[in-house]
Each structure stands twice: as C-alpha cells, then as structure tokens.
C-alpha cells in the first residue's frame, strides 16, 4: 500500500469517527462496533470458484481447530503461493494475502474479520470474542 493510500485510509477513518487524528490512535470502541456490526455490510465478500490460495475466515489459524468443516468448506484468498485449495474469497484489499503471509497477528485478525463477513452464527460469535480480545490486548 502506498503512503498516499495509507493517508487516504486514515483520513476516511477519521471522517467515519474510527480514528482520532489528534491522538493518532484508533477509537477502539467505535472500531469494535464497526467490525462486529458493519463490516459484513460495507465489505460483502465475492465468492468464486475453487482455486489455490491462503485459508481465511473460519478455516484460518484462529478458528480452524474450533469447527469441523468439509474440504468443500475451505475459503481461500486466491494467491499463487497459497498452500491450500478452496473456494475463492475476496480479501478486503488486493495486497492482503501477500502481507498476511509476512505477519501472523495481522493474518489472524483478518481471518476473524472474514469470518464476520461470511460465517454462521456460532463462528461469528467466537470470531467476535477473539477479535474483541485482540483489540483490547493491542489497544
């Protein structure tokens, strides 16, 4: 992501009252509310065909051991270096798969957010709890 794109993102987050430009920090409660209740409407996923990629949503590391799923239920961000076959799932931003492979915590957080975008009630409930814990710990 270029510096100008990052600046634009911070500006939009400030306008949406998700970021405090004076303290230069995200507003945790507002961010939590948006992630839990708004992200699935603002960023609905595009579901595609079977492809190779990086597991996401409830098949990503934070949730993969909590739920039983069939091989047909694996969702992946399409990526040539991906190690798993699954149903194509659009990332929030095109460079996310590349960045997520380099940062374990970011990958975990994005997998939880994707669960909120796609998951069923039990998966969403656990993803909410883990994401809120992650936000509190990193606040």
What are the residue ranges of the model-derived segments?
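Short, cationic-aromatic polyanion-contact patches
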Residues: 18-50
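Short, solvent-exposed secondary-structure capping/transition elements
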Residues: 5-7, 22, 124-125
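Generic structural hydrophobic/aromatic packing signal, biased to beta-strands
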Residues: 13, 21-22, 77, 127
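Hydrophobic/aromatic-lined pockets within catalytic cores
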Residues: 14, 18, 117
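A short structural micro-motif
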Residues: 16, 133-137
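Exposed, interaction-prone assembly regions rather than primary DNA-binding/catalytic cores
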Residues: 43-132
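Short amphipathic alpha-helical interaction segments
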Residues: 2-15
């Amino acid at each position: 992501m270029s510096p100008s794109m990052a600046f634009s993102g911070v500006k939009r987050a400030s306008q949406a009252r998700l970021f405090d430009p004076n303290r230069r920090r995200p507003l945790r409660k507002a961010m939590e509310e948006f992630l839990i209740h708004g992200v699935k409407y603002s960023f609905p996923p595009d579901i595609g065909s079977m492809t190779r990629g990086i597991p996401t949503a409830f098949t990503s590391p934070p949730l993969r051991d909590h739920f039983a799923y069939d091989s047909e239920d694996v969702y992946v961000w399409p990526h040539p270096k991906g190690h798993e076959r699954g149903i194509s799932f659009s990332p929030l931003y095109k460079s996310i798969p590349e960045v997520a492979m380099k940062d374990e915590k970011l990958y975990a957080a994005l997998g939880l957010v994707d669960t909120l975008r796609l998951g069923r009630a039990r998966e969403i409930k656990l993803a909410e709890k883990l994401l809120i814990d992650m936000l509190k710990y990193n606040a």
